[in-house]
C-alpha cells in the first residue's frame, strides 16, 4: 500500500512506496510536493513552443479555472506578466525549473533560497560578490552553487525572489490543499502505476538501468508534466525522474512511456554529443537533436525490453506533438516526426545493444 506522508502543520510532502517492502526494488514510485509546486509555477508562466510540450497541455487553463471558481488571486497573478516576460528572455531562468528536484521538502527549498539571496544581495539591494568556494559549510556551498547556476545575475536574483514569493502565496492560499486533494483523488492511479512498475516493468528495465549506471533511483509522478519528464542525476542516490501523473487508471502506462524517454538520456545525450562538432554545439545544432534523440531512444529501448509498449509509446508522443499518423505505421511516423542524423541513430542502436547484452 502507498502511504501519504505529511510534514508538521499538515503540509503535504509526498506519497511513497516503501523500499522496505521490496528489498530488491532499487527504484521506487513516489510524489514530492515541492517538485510539483515549483514546476507548477513554471507551467503557469512558461510559453510552450517545443514539439513535445514541457508541460501537460491544458494544465494552465485548468488551474486558472480552479482559481476563478474559488475567487482566488495570488502574487503569481499580479506579478505574472513581469515574471513571464523575463523568463521568456533568459534561458538560464528556464533551467531553474529543476531546482525543486534537489530538495526533499518545500520548507528546505525555501530556506535554501532565502539563505542564497541573503548572501547574494545586501539589505540595500546591492549585489554582493559571492564565491561559493569560500563558504565554510560544504552543504551550503553545494546548494548555493546549484541555485547560482540559474540565478547568478542581479536581475535573475530579483526574478527568483519574486517567483519564490509568488510560490509561497500559491502554497498558502490554495495549492497545498489542491495538491492534497489531487493525491487523494488519484490514489487508485498511483497504485496502478506502482503496480505496473513493481510487478512488471522494473524487471524489464532493470538490466538497462544497471548497465547504464542507473541501478537505483526514484520515479516521481508529477501533476504539471506530460511527455517531457525532468531528470536529476545524483551520483550518491541515483537519478530522480519526474514523469507524468496520468489522469486515469487506464492511462497508468503513460508513466512507463515517459520513464523510458527519460532513462535513455545518458545514451541519447552521449550519441548526440559524440556526433556533433564543437561548432555545431556552439550554434545550437546539438540541442536541436536532444529531444528527437530521447523520443527515438525511448522507442528503441522499449522495442528491446517491452515490445508490447511500443505502439502506445509512439502514439503518446505523436499525440503530444500533435502529429497525425496511420494506425499500424506509428513507428515510421515517429522516425519521420523526430528525425536524427544517421550517425546518431546508429550509435543509439549500438549502445543499446551493448547495454542489453550479456547477463
Language-model features: locations:
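Post-HEXXH active-site segment of zinc metalloproteases
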Residues: 269-294
